[in-house]
Amino acid sequence: VIKEWESISSIHEFDIPFVRRYFIDKNMVPLTLHQATGEFVSQKSRAAVFRADSIEQVGSDTLYNPRVLAFDIETYSPFDLTIDAEKNPIIMLSFYGENFKKVFVWKRFKTAIGYIEFVDSESDLIEKFRETIDNYKPDILTGYFSDGFDLPYIKTRADKYKIKLDIGLDFSELRVKSARETTVAINGITHLDIFKFIKKIIGTTMETYSYDLNAVASELLDEKKHDVSLAELTDVWDNRHENLEKFCEYNLHDSLLTFNLAVKMLPTIIEMVKIVGIPI
C-alpha cells in the first residue's frame, strides 16, 4: 500500500533484517513443520548438512518441546572490588536440563553430592563448558543475564587460555556482539537470555520492580534462590574450601530456576515467534 503513495518513490526494506525478509518472501513460519527438497552434502558439522533447493511449510504443527539447557557461573569477586573478567577467574559452573544436572568446580572438598564434579583448573572448567554443550546437544542454551554477564565473561576467560569456544553446530565460535547492547550468538543453537525476555516483554505486567533472579522466580515460579551469602564466597574459596558445598548447591539452584523460567516462558515465546515471523 505504501509504495502506491504518490509521495513514495521507492521502498528498499533496509530496516527489515535479512532473516525476517527471507521468512516473509518464502511464506515460512518459524518452529512449524516444513518440507525441503535437495540433497545432503559432506561438510564438517555436528549436524547433518542439507542443501535445499526448495522449502515449504506443510503443516501448522509446532515444536513445543525443544531441548533446553540452562547454565550459570560463579566468579571470584573480592567484595570490595568491581567484577573484572580480565583478572578474576570463574570458580564454579553449573548446568541444568531434563534429567541432567552438573556443577564443575576446581577446588576439592569432601562431598556426597553426585552432581558435583571436580576439575583441576579454571581452564579445565572452561573446557567442560564446551564439552557439556557438545554432549547434551541443546536446541536452546539459556541463562539469566547471560548476554550481559555469563557468556561474555566465559569468552573473556577462554581467550585468556586460548581456548576456542567452537560450540556452534558448524564448529564456529561463540560470538559476542556489542552494539546498543551486548548479545551473544551461537550458530545452530538458540541462545535465550531469559532475563531479557522477561524484562522487555512481560516486565510491565509484573508486580516486582526488581528483575533479579530471586524476585522474578519468586513471582513467576513461587520459588526462591538459596539463602547463602555470596560475600563470603571469596574467603571460603581462599581459606575454607571445605565449606564450598553449599555454594555449589546455590550455583546449581540458579541454573534450575533459570531452566524453569525458560520452560514456563517457552509457550509465550513460541507464539510470539509464529506471529512476528522471526526465530527465537
Regions found by a protein language model. Give the residues of each.
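The two-metal-ion catalytic cores of nucleic-acid processing enzymes
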Residues: 1-200, 204-280
